[in-house]
Amino acid sequence: MAVDRQLANVRSGVCYVGLVYKRQPKADDSRHACCAAQMFLSDGEGVVFRGALGPWYQPDSKQFHLDRSAAQQLASTVLGEYRLRHPDDPNPAELFIHAKSSFSDDEWGGFVDACQGKGTNVVGVQIADA
């Protein structure tokens, strides 16, 4: 029996990415955290990436933000994996990023930089607590 792994209401050509962070309690800097990203596609496939360790936690806002370079590197890694899985259509029409934190201008710039010249629109959504 074939299993349909298609996800409901997921658009073809869109690369969905969820960002999560884990603070590193034993680090010398209380802002130190690890970022991870889960990419999933319309066919139900998913891949988890470990992003960079760094001072991503902002105690004043209690949110996590990558710097521009780390955001660009993470998005570039995701896009590279997308290309491996879609050799006939190597760039997604849209990179849809969601996280519990808002996106800083610096972080957003890194995501946009990674998509520059690829015809990929970047969309971000902050997930609010219910």
Question: What are the language-model segments listed below?
Answer:
Residues 1-130:
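Long, contiguous domain-sized segments
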